[in-house]
Amino acid sequence: MIERGKFRSLTLINWNGFFARTFDLDELVTTLSGGNGAGKSTTMAAFVTALIPDLTLLHFRNTTEAGATSGSRDKGLHGKLKAGVCYSMLDTINSRHQRVVVGVRLQQVAGRDRKVDIKPFAIQGLPMSVQPTQLVTETLNERQARVLPLNELKDKLEAMEGVQFKQFNSITDYHSLMFDLGIIARRLRSASDRSKFYRLIEASLYGGISSAITRSLRDYLLPENSGVRKAFQDMEAALRENRMTLEAIRVTQSDRDLFKHLISEATNYVAADYMRHANERRVHLDKALEFRRELHTSRQQLAAEQYKHVDMARELAEHNGAEGDLEADYQAASDHLNLVQTALRQQEKIERYEADLDELQIRLEEQNEVVAEAIERQEENEARAEAAELEVDELKSQLADYQQALDVQQTRAIQYNQAIAALNRAKELCHLPDLTADSAAEWLETFQAKELEATEKMLSLEQKMSMAQTAHSQFEQAYQLVVAINGPLARNEAWDVARELLREGVDQRHLAEQVQPLRMRLSELEQRLREQQEAERLLADFCKRQGKNFDIDELEALHQELEARIASLSDSVSNAREERMALRQEQEQLQSRIQSLMQRAPVWLAAQNSLNQLSEQCGEEFTSSQDVTEYLQQLLEREREAIVERDEVGARKNAVDEEIERLSQPGGSEDQRLNALAERFGGVLLSEIYDDVSLEDAPYFSALYGPSRHAIVVPDLSQVTEHLDGLTDCPEDLYLIEGDPQSFDDSVFSVDELEKAVVVKIADRQWRYSRFPEVPLFGRAARESRIESLHAEREVLSERFATLSFDVQKTQRLHQAFSRFIGSHLAVVFESDPEAEIRQLNSRRVELERALSNHENDNQQQRIQFEQAKEGVTALNRILPRLNLLADDSLADRVDEIRERLDEAQEAARFVQQFGNQLAKLEPIVSVLQSDPEQFEQLKEDYAYSQQMQRDARQQAFALTEVVQRRAHFSYSDSAEMLSGNSDLNEKLRERLEQAEAERTRAREALRGHAAQLSQYNQVLASLKSSYDTKKELLNDLQRELQDIGVRADSGAEERARIRRDELHAQLSNNRSRRNQLEKALTFCEAEMDNLTRKLRKLERDYFEMREQVVTAKAGWCAVMRMVKDNGVERRLHRRELAYLSADDLRSMSDKALGALRLAVADNEHLRDVLRMSEDPKRPERKIQFFVAAYQHLRERIRQDIIRTDDPVEAIEQMEIELSRLTEELTSREQKLVISSRSVANIIRKTIQREQNRIRMLNQGLQNVSFGQVNSVRLNVNVRETHAMLLDVLSEQHEQHQDLFNSNRLTFSEALAKLYQRLNPQIDMGQRTPQTIGEELLDYRNYLEMEVEVNRGSDGWLRAESGALSTGEAIGTGMSILVMVVQSWEDESRRLRGKDISPCRLLFLDEAARLDARSIATLFELCERLQMQLIIAAPENISPEKGTTYKLVRKVFQNTEHVHVVGLRGFAPQLPETLPGTDEAPSQAS
């Protein structure tokens, strides 16, 4: 029999009162005896701390705190330790005789919270001779020792051979080791399990009936049926997963259209934009290249036009210069003609005016003589009138002064002043400073005499003047003629100059007669010279146009060469036209062919895409239509083979499912009828009794019982007999065995065990030999093992079946795809590649365009050469007739010579024409120039002087006369004398005034008459002089004009000038015509250059913009391509058939897809934002980001449990293959997974029945326990009424509630909860969910009610409550319950632990003084019967007769507190003896 493990000792190190104390524990009861504060509770606290080192649970309260709601602040542990390292260790020995030391290292943590640090550890392999205190202490001397810290302890143990030290970081690991080694009874997997264990220890420690345990006895006593719960959970999980998968399939089916729509629209949206950008990039590149070609061509054209413009501008400049010269010559010729005509008219006017001047000269001389006589008479009259006027004025002045003096007395002074003024004036005029009033009369006579003398002298000079006048006029006339011809000169030189002029006139007339012959000769030579110059100009222009200088002798040969070149170029131009037409015809044919190929290309590309998809799907390459049809036949054969294999795998999988279902029956029954028969017979299936058999023992028991392993064990066979009569619903062989199901063993057979077999002696004459089965199915462990292997096989079969089904579906879809391909694309798919042909044709088209361009250039050059040759021939036709003129080199010299002679002759003719008349007039009177009448001028001056002297003498006489007349004013004496004296004077003055006025009147009349006559004479003279001067001036002007004209007017001059003008006009017209042509050509050339310049600028701008756009687009395109390649979507986006659509079509396609996508992603915020960002036309990469995001979104939505791919497009293809198959398979799987409500009820009932039997067995162990009035203790287990009704409905009336269990919306747990609510509407479920309630209803423990009952005195069986029992009875009852719990835990954990391990049993009891001796004896008896260790604490008055007793006494020695311990063995049979080594000397830690 397996020995039970025991606790050997408890060691306390550095606890309060215990420095190093080891308590040896008795195999039954260990008693700690001592007074208050002796250390009993501390010792038990150390044991509990080493057993359960969980600070969240540990709480050591004193007995006085039993009614307190909260304990001490440190929960009782901190105060039980000393400073420094502390240990609590348990020394145990298990059923395998292995010594295991487990314990904890404790250490106080500084701080107000009074915390304790705990480190659990375990020591294995420690020799029995080593004491625990030796491990953790180090002796320093006889009186001192040191506690080793944990790391030193570890090092010390590692140095010992065979000793293992383990330190644990978690309490779970610590308890797991203790459970595996048999130290604790139950595996404590969680904090809840630890809490239950601690509550059990706490309940035993403080005694009594623990309400915490009695309220939850089900949790303590009834094991959790994890297998059933796990089965239900697995079933529900499988059903939930199945239904979720089915729902996912339905969602996927609904999403499939969304997937298709989203993928197709996203592909259309992004691919259209992608291909549009690709097309635009290609178009932009083509445009950039075209712009560059056009730019190069335009630059060449502009350079050619610029060269042409320079040539024409140079020629135009030459023509402009020539035109200026010709205009100047023409203007000069016109001016010369005008001058000749003007000179002729001037000459006629001069002759006419000269005749008029001669006539006027004669009349003017006559009138001069008349006027001279009239002037003399007029002067005499003027002098006489002036004298009379002066006399009258003087007399009036004198008379006026006199009247004033008479009127006013004051006028005397005025008169006196006037007299003085007259005297002064007379002094000044007469130059007589000594003149006085008295001497004025004398001087008056003198000056009157001078006046008379001057008058006589003037008259004599006047007579001399008239006589010399005639001789002087002839000399002056001759002299003026000489001055007019020769210019100013001295009078004495006039004679010599006049003779020289007359001789020169004769020579000039001889030269003037030669003007006309010279002019005619000059005109002829000038005409030839102009023709020569024109020929030279034509030759120079021809050489310039030809770009080469030619000699005169080479021109005829050149003329013939140019004519031959014209003929050959004409043939070349005609041939080039035909060649150009042929090239253009070929180009049109190529263009037509390219258009047809471009129309066929999308169809071919679609067929190729379909073919590539088929090739990718089947992994084959097709080169002809025959390959396609042959592969289609292979597909049909492959489909048939796959269907056959799929059906075989499906049949095997169904067989495995059936076997799994059969093995999964509760109780190990493979036939449901056996469960019903066992329930009917009141028995238990043999497989249920052996349900806990281990996997190693399963083959043995399976062979032992053989066919009877499915037997029913019944208590009494006789009671079954009546049920066998008429029994039909049963297996063919039904085995019944009589025995007690609670204590059944294999003693019913006589067995001999052989090698892997047994011989069963059923009877004396019947043996059965059974070999151990290779796959045992007896016992739950064997069945679970088999089920596990079957599940693995089923997974393989399911995967194979799914693979085959997928292959069949894939093959069928591939067959359909091939059929569609044959019907749609087979006719065109294997034709030649239109794109390759398009590329070849495009290259040929480029060659043709290049050939046409070269041909046009060559043809243009030929045309230019042809035109140049024609122009050269035309120019030579004008030059060749003038070759003789070009050869005449002396023509210009002869023209210059004749021109010089003509200039001399014309100069002579102009001299004769200008001075011929003057010379003719001078010739008759030239002799008068020999003597110059100079005295005429002197006489003329003397006459003027005498006139002046006569006027001065007259004024002097008049002044003296006035003085003499005012002589009376100088001597006024008084007023009377002045009045009387002046009265006579007044009368005289008046008389004289009257005489003077009469004389003045006569003089005035004579002067007036003679003045009128003189005026008439002067008018006639002035008119004649004016006419003469005018005509003379006009004649001089005409002569000067004629001289200024500088031409000699003769009869032929006008005709020669007109001919010259007409010739120059013709040349000027020709030059202007050519200039106009050049200007027009130059204007056209400039316009063409401007157009080319604008075109060039536009092309440069367009080219650079396009190039910049290409470069910018290239960067963006590179980013797009990188993003496309990184995300692997190029195959989806690069749809070549879209390359043949226009940009508008692609944009329209993208816009339509965008509108559809906006609706499709309206509910997805992420895709909506990405789609909105992708609408930016400047950021094409964002569309790729949207496409990637859409694909990622679809990938995330792909059900990986259904579809095994990341590609949404492939997912859609696989969806259509998988959905129907999965739907069918999952529906059948759900039908198989669903467990019936009757099965659930049977499982729960069987479990309840088994646990009731187990509790009944536990009650048998407590029948003999009694405490005081308590005679017996038992556990009563009943099924709750509400739950019993639920089980009845599940097993008998489940058809009425199939609406719950057949609903796909409810799990089985939820359906069970709904049924429970339906059956018990009065029960409030609170806030719990149906799933939670259903899971509770699947736990059989919730169906049971457990309570502790005691048989007390005459009251019989009563419910155990603290109020109805005494303290001792309550402690005994509680201890009984705890023992039952421990035993229940051991039974529950027997399957989890090795068969050779029987765990330690130990409980506590503090304050055992409350029990009487009989109760304590009962505890001893219970411990002995149950092999349980007990530690109790009691005062000193308790001395048990059995076990080991320690007496504890707390002492103080030298300020050091310690506990003195004395140990005693049981002393009832013999004298007590002191245990060795129990007396502890005082010590203190160093």
Curated annotation (Swiss-Prot):
Binding site for ATP: G34, G35, N36, G37, A38, G39, K40, S41
Record bears the keyword Magnesium: no
Compartments (UniProt record): Cytoplasm, Nucleoid
Pfam families: MukB, MukB_hinge, SbcC_Walker_B
Coiled coil: 326-418, 444-480, 509-603, 835-923, 977-1115, 1209-1266
Entry superkingdom: Bacteria
Gene3D superfamilies: 1.20.58.850, 3.40.1140.10, Immunoglobulin FC, subunit C, MukB, hinge domain
Keyword terms: ATP-binding, Cell cycle, Cell division, Chromosome partition, Coiled coil, Cytoplasm, DNA condensation, DNA-binding, Nucleotide-binding
Signal peptide: none
Family: Belongs to the SMC family. MukB subfamily.
Subunit architecture: Homodimerization via its hinge domain. Binds to DNA via its C-terminal region. Interacts, and probably forms a ternary complex, with MukE and MukF via its C-terminal region. The complex formation is stimulated by calcium or magnesium. Interacts with tubulin-related protein FtsZ.
Protein name: Chromosome partition protein MukB
Organism of this sequence: Shigella boydii serotype 18 (strain CDC 3083-94 / BS512)
Upper classification of the organism: Bacteria, Pseudomonadati, Pseudomonadota, Gammaproteobacteria, Enterobacterales
